[in-house]
């Protein structure tokens, strides 16, 4: 189990949203590069970056902040938000981003995921965000009629590195991840699943470690480490004990 610290970017700053609502944002740091260095210093093994403005606009919006993060750290990075075409993937990978996350475009155009995986093997992650089990897209502004499991199954065999599963109702609410839904998704597919949304305590991490054998390989944390509810270094030490 790998703990993955998140940096969510809005207007060039590190922010956290509640349940994906852009108007419910809290700025935690106006220097994303410095924040990235801090998470690396505490033992972060991968950084999760989200271009929130990009997710809503459907095109990259925080390039200079993303560049600052990549230049500041030596650990791998993964980035999502507004990635809708091959050219954008290419641009981010050449910038030094390790893996890109396809979200809305994966639901709207599954063939795009297949094409991206063929062109950039090992570099493509699919982000599936769900509200009451149904996939939400366009920065979570629109809920579709397809379930998370139905969507995830479409990518079996495409070469997707991982699926990031976010339960929107838990995101930023500090109520613990949706263990049941995450486990059910991981058991339904062969692709490794990374949990996201709601992590609030070391107990939550223990609960996720308990379902690791189902195929849950990591967890993304944002608000909990920014607010101090979880100490990142302690959380990482806990997972390393189990490895």
From Swiss-Prot:
It is found in: Cytoplasm. Pfam families: His_biosynth (PF00977). Its EC number is 5.3.1.16. One of its GO terms (cellular component) is cytoplasm. The keyword Amino-acid biosynthesis applies. It catalyses: 1-(5-phospho-beta-D-ribosyl)-5-[(5-phospho-beta-D-ribosylamino)methylideneamino]imidazole-4-carboxamide = 5-[(5-phospho-1-deoxy-D-ribulos-1-ylimino)methylamino]-1-(5-phospho-beta-D-ribosyl)imidazole-4-carboxamide. Belongs to the HisA/HisF family. This is 1-(5-phosphoribosyl)-5-[(5-phosphoribosylamino)methylideneamino] imidazole-4-carboxamide isomerase. It comes from Geobacter sp. (strain M21). The lineage of its organism: Bacteria, Pseudomonadati, Thermodesulfobacteriota, Desulfuromonadia, Geobacterales.
